[in-house]
């Protein structure tokens, strides 16, 4: 069993990107997702608030929520997947919860979070995409 765990750790250590910015719950982020359409490849941005973060090594995910024409749209992004082309933290917010699921029942201005003024990390771009 110990050899199996060592093998899994060795594989995951190769897939984990160490230069990813520190993404926290409450952050307003823009994630560029690489989409293959026929023989063309393009990057589609998805901008929204991080409402949850699941830490599991190479399987870590973030759930991002945005409101589009009055309808809430949520999407779960695996942080270390090759389809994530870039990641940018646009704004930080002061939150006192680990999961912001209460934002699902709110609309309009009620979904705003109190901004935290601190230096933001650099834009991260996947070097394998270019």
UniProtKB/Swiss-Prot annotation:
Pfam families per record: Ribosomal_L19
Gene Ontology process terms (BP): translation
Domain of life: Eukaryota
UniProt keywords, alphabetically: Chloroplast, Plastid, Ribonucleoprotein, Ribosomal protein
Molecular-function annotations in GO: structural constituent of ribosome
Places the protein is found: Plastid, Chloroplast
Record NCBIfam families: rplS_bact (TIGR01024)
Family the UniProt entry places it in: Belongs to the bacterial ribosomal protein bL19 family.
UniProt name for this protein: Large ribosomal subunit protein bL19c
Species for this entry: Chlorella vulgaris
Gene: rpl19
């Amino acid at each position: 069993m110990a050899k199996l765990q060592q093998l899994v750790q060795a594989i995951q250590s190769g897939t984990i990107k160490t230069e990813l910015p520190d993404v926290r719950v409450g952050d307003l982020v823009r994630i560029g997702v690489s989409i293959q359409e026929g023989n063309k490849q393009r990057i589609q941005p998805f901008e929204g608030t991080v409402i949850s973060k699941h830490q599991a090594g190479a399987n870590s995910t973030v759930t991002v929520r945005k409101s589009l024409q009055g309808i809430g749209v949520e999407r779960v992004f695996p942080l270390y997947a090759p389809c994530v082309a870039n990641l940018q933290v646009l704004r930080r917010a002061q939150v006192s919860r680990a999961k912001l699921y209460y934002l699902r029942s709110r609309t309009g201005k009620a979904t705003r979070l109190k901004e935290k003024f601190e230096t933001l990390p650099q834009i991260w771009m996947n070097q394998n995409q270019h």
